[in-house]
């Protein structure tokens, strides 16, 4: 399935926006707080409080390694994809087998790791910083999962280019 012009523009901006999100937000799972910008710490802290994101609060080891993979594999790919989408015509993007291969690899990696996060949210979601680890309500789980859902669905489409 090819990417049309509008889809290419969408993914161009998706990757542009995802670069600072990866650097300042997602990286908070692996980078010690003393090396993070204050504003990034506040954004993460506010997100955890508002969305009850126990994963970003808890930072389980498996999530740590997912984020390491995001920083080592996906972040350089974001720059590569931005360059390719910015400087290529629709025909070039759809006929560039190397680009398509990397889009698929990114798609599978990002959608699978995010799917695991979503499953964990529904399986054991709880309110962060609560001593009793009170379970999230179904509404709260759905709200938190909806934050993760775009980073499952958007990359999933790339598995089929």
Curated annotation (Swiss-Prot):
Residues 7-159 form the EXPERA domain. One of its GO terms (cellular component) is endoplasmic reticulum. Residues 32-61, 123-141 are lumenal. It is found in: Endoplasmic reticulum membrane. PROSITE patterns: EXPERA. Its main location: endoplasmic reticulum. GO terms for biological process: protein targeting to mitochondrion. It is a multi-pass membrane protein. The chain crosses the membrane at residues 11-31, 62-82, 102-122, 142-160. It comes from the Eukaryota. The keyword Endoplasmic reticulum applies. Keywords: Endoplasmic reticulum, Membrane, Transmembrane, Transmembrane helix. Present with 358 molecules/cell in log phase SD medium. Part of an import route for newly synthesized mitochondrial proteins termed the ER-SURF pathway (ER surface-mediated protein targeting), which retrieves mitochondrial precursor proteins from the ER surface and reroutes them to mitochondria for efficient mitochondrial import. Acts as a quality control factor in the ER, promoting the proteolytic degradation of nonproductive and extramitochondrial precursor proteins in the ER membrane thus removing them from the ER surface. Belongs to the TMEM97/sigma-2 receptor family. This is Efficient mitochondria targeting-associated protein 19. It comes from Saccharomyces cerevisiae (strain ATCC 204508 / S288c). The gene is EMA19.
């Amino acid at each position: 399935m090819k990417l049309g012009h509008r889809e290419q523009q969408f993914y161009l901006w998706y990757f542009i926006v995802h670069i600072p999100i990866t650097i300042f937000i997602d990286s908070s799972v692996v980078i010690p707080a003393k090396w993070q910008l204050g504003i990034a710490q506040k954004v993460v802290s506010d997100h955890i409080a508002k969305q009850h994101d126990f994963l970003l609060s808890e930072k389980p080891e498996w999530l740590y390694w997912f984020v390491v993979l995001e920083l080592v594999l996906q972040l350089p790919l974001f720059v590569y994809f931005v360059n390719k989408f910015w400087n290529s015509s629709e025909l070039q993007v759809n006929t560039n087998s190397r680009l398509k291969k990397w889009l698929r690899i990114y798609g599978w990696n990002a959608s699978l790791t995010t799917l695991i996060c979503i499953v964990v949210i529904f399986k054991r979601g709880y309110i962060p910083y609560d001593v009793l680890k009170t379970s999230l309500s179904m509404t709260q789980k759905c709200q938190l999962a909806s934050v993760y859902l775009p980073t499952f669905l958007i990359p999933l489409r790339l598995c089929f280019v």
